Amino acid sequence: MLLRLPGTPPQPTPECKSVSLKRDCLPYLLCAILLAAAVSMMQLGLSPALTRQFATDTTAISQQVAWLLGLSAVAALIAQFGVLRPQRLTPVALLLSAGVLMSGGLAIMLSEQLWLFYPGCAVLSFGAALATPAYQLLLNDKLADGAGAGWLATSHTLGYGLCALLVPLVSKTGVAIALIMAALFATILFTIVSVFIWHYRTIK
C-alpha cells in the first residue's frame, strides 16, 4: 500500500471509460462500416471498370489491377509515415480529410482515361489510410480501448458483409463502373457522417 507524502497534492482519479456501447458512439461505427464497404467495392469494381479499355483481355486487366493495388499500398504507407506518425492533424481533421480524399479519388476513377485510375486509386487509398486511426482515436475517447477495438472490428466485418450483399444487386445494372459509383456513394455518406461528427463535437 502506498501512502501520500505530507504536502503533496492528491493524484487525479483516472477517468473511467465505459465498455458498453452508447448512442453517441454510433456515428464512428457507421464510418467504419462505410469505409470497409467502399474500399471493398472499389477493389471488386476495378476489373469491370477496366473492361472499358481492355474489353475481354483478362491478362491486361489483371496486370492493371495488380499495379493499381500496389500503388494503393504505397499511398497508404506514405499516409502512415507522412501524416499519421508525425501526428500532423487532429483526429477530426483526419476524418474530414479522409472523406474528401476518398470521394475525390473515386470521382477521378469514373473517367474512361486509364491513366486517371492511378492518381484516383492513390488518392482514395491515401484517404482510407487516414480514416481508420481517426475514428478509432475518437471512439477511444468514449469507450475503453478493448471495447472500442472490438466494436470497430465488428463494424468492419459488417461493412464487408454489406459489400457482399450489394455487389450482385449493383452488378445487375450492367454498367461497367457501377461498383465504383456505389463506392463513391458510400464515401459521400462517410463524408456526411464525418461532418456531423465535427459539428457535434464543436457545439458540445
Q: Can you name each region flagged by the protein language model?
A:
Residues L44-Q64:
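Short amphipathic helix-loop junctions that connect adjacent transmembrane helices
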Residues Q64-Q87:
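Transmembrane alpha-helices of Major Facilitator/SLC transporters
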Residues A93-A107:
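Structural signature of the two symmetry-related core transmembrane helices
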Residues M1-P12, I192-W198:
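C-terminal membrane-cytosol helix-exit motif in multi-pass small-molecule transporters
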Residues A129-L143:
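Intracellular juxtamembrane helix-capping segments at the cytosolic ends
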Residues K22-M42, A122-F126:
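Pair of pore-lining "gating" transmembrane helices in MFS-fold secondary transporters
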Residues L5-C31:
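Juxtamembrane intracellular "pre-TM" segments in multi-pass secondary transporters
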Residues L143-V175:
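A late C-terminal transmembrane helix in Major Facilitator Superfamily
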